[in-house]
């Protein structure tokens, strides 16, 4: 039996302006080289651009985009008898949100455009509508899990 205790699960803090945990999670993922003020600037500009584009509540667009990109199931490489199988595993809500945010940021960085705020706002609006690279990544992951359903018993 292990002598070490289990780690306490940290709850995400909310950001200072919108008092929203998802915004803060997004800020922490976009952060580079410890420049948090720049990360906040990018996110808030993106939120303003979403407001201008859709003329609806930008936080509801953000929520809808993250909900749309969040995967239910993913594949994990598992070595069994000398060969590696892609084993489908269910994902919890926290891990799913983290994956969704990561995919949204990767997709927005790949986009052509002027600046990160513009690219991020475009990707979030597209994801809320059900299109874009992040949605494609989720569908690809689900297809992969479905194709490897035979290995589900290796969990």
From Swiss-Prot:
GO molecular function terms listed in the Swiss-Prot or TrEMBL record: rRNA binding; structural constituent of ribosome
UniProt key word Ribonucleoprotein: yes
GO cellular component terms listed in the entry, alphabetical order: chloroplast; small ribosomal subunit
Domain of life assignment: Eukaryota
One protein family per Pfam: Ribosomal_S7
Coiled coil: none
InterPro entries given in the database record: Ribosomal_uS7, Ribosomal_uS7_bac/org-type, Ribosomal_uS7_CS, Ribosomal_uS7_dom, Ribosomal_uS7_dom_sf
PROSITE patterns registered for this protein in UniProt: RIBOSOMAL_S7
GTP-binding among keywords: no
Primary localisation category: plastid
Compartment(s): Plastid, Chloroplast
Function of the protein: One of the primary rRNA binding proteins, it binds directly to 16S rRNA where it nucleates assembly of the head domain of the 30S subunit.
Sequence similarity: Belongs to the universal ribosomal protein uS7 family.
Name of the protein: Small ribosomal subunit protein uS7c
Organism listed in the record: Asparagus officinalis (Garden asparagus)
